[in-house]
């Protein structure tokens, strides 16, 4: 047997909403595959990012934030996150250095008590927090759970992230190569394109509008000469008033969303993109199980 066996495994990144889970995954991969915003509950689906290092393949799983779920959509999101705890080789519990452990963190710790995989506590945003406060956080969490490792990082600047990845590599079991080494994620490009459009809605609208929005890519066609990708997508909202906000005065907001999304999709695909957006109303879709399935939340 080799003295340095190949290691591989699945690693879930969990935490309450808006602690930097998606930012951390994008930082590790060196590419943006997961959308981000300053609003909580941006991530809705389980997304896998594949990171290859010498002697190992790490499959990171970005999850929705764990929170009190009221709508059917939110309950789906929480179940996605909880299932990612049960099915992995390692759990990264991400918290913020500038926030004391509260009720949400304790609820997650209570869930972790039933986890069979080891758990790392990853303390994010240390660049925005005084060292004394970081040490206080470490002590507070140590009293609550027997974490395998406690790792301070900044997903925003990258500080400590390489060290975290090395600790993750060492903690994984021996295993096979799950994905080809040129694969960055298991989700298709059309899914990422839809997520980019939804991200722009999150960033450019306010109040309930982002949370009432879903995006479907209706068509994704590549020209035979490879010179252009034509994408048609539908933005679904729950109210006529929300549709009006998305479209904006004389279509200005929809044009702004489409323009920003197109630029980012072109970077993703490394080609020119023609993007056409439509807006429709499906009343209370986030509470309707049939519509949730149609929109991909299953």
From Swiss-Prot:
| One GO term (biological process) | ribosomal small subunit assembly
Where is each KH type-2 domain found?
Answer: 205-283
Q: Where is this region: G4?
A: 124-127
Q: Where is this protein chiefly located?
A: cytoplasm
Domain of life where this protein originates: Bacteria
* Listed InterPro entries: G_ERA_dom, GTP-bd, GTPase_Era-like, KH_dom-like_a/b, KH_dom_type_2, KH_sf_prok-type, P-loop_NTPase, Small_GTP-bd
Q: Where does GTP bind?
A: 15-22, 62-66, 124-127
Region named G3? 62-65
What Gene3D superfamilies does the record point to? 3.30.300.20, P-loop containing nucleotide triphosphate hydrolases (3.40.50.300)
Coiled-coil regions listed in the entry: none
Record Pfam families: KH_2, MMR_HSR1
Q: Tell me the keywords, alphabetical order.
A: Cell inner membrane, Cell membrane, Cytoplasm, GTP-binding, Membrane, Nucleotide-binding, Ribosome biogenesis, RNA-binding, rRNA-binding
User: Which HAMAP family does this one have?
Assistant: GTPase_Era
Q: How does it assemble?
A: Monomer.
Recorded protein name is GTPase Era
């Amino acid at each position: 047997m080799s003295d340095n066996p190949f290691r591989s495994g699945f690693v879930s990144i969990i935490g309450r909403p808006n602690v930097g889970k998606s930012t951390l995954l994008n930082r590790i991969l060196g590419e943006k595959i997961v959308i981000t915003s300053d609003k909580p509950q941006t991530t809705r689906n389980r997304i896998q990012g594949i990171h290859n290092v010498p002697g190992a393949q790490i499959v990171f799983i970005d999850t929705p934030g764990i929170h009190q779920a009221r709508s059917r959509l939110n309950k789906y999101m929480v179940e996605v996150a909880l299932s990612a705890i049960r099915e992995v080789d390692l759990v990264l519990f991400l918290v913020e250095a500038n926030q004391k452990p509260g009720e949400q963190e304790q609820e997650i710790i209570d869930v972790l008590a039933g986890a069979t995989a080891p758990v790392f506590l990853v303390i994010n945003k240390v660049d925005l927090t005084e060292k004394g406060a970081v040490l206080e956080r470490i002590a507070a969490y140590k009293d609550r759970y027997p974490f395998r490792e406690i790792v301070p990082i900044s997903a925003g600047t990258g500080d400590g992230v390489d060290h975290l990845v090395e600790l993750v590599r060492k903690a994984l079991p021996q295993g096979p190569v799950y994905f080809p080494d040129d694969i960055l994620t298991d989700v298709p490009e059309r899914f990422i394109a839809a997520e980019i459009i939804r991200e722009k809605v999150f960033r450019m609208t306010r109040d309930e509008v982002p949370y009432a929005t879903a995006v479907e890519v209706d068509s994704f066609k590549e020209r035979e000469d490879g010179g252009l990708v034509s994408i048609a997508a539908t933005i679904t909202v729950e109210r006529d008033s929300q549709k009006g906000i998305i479209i904006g005065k004389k279509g200005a907001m929809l044009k702004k969303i489409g323009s920003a999304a197109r630029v980012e999709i072109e970077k993703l695909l490394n080609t020119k993109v023609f993007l056409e957006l439509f807006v429709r109303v499906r009343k209370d879709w986030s509470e309707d199980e049939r519509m949730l399935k149609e929109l991909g939340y299953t």
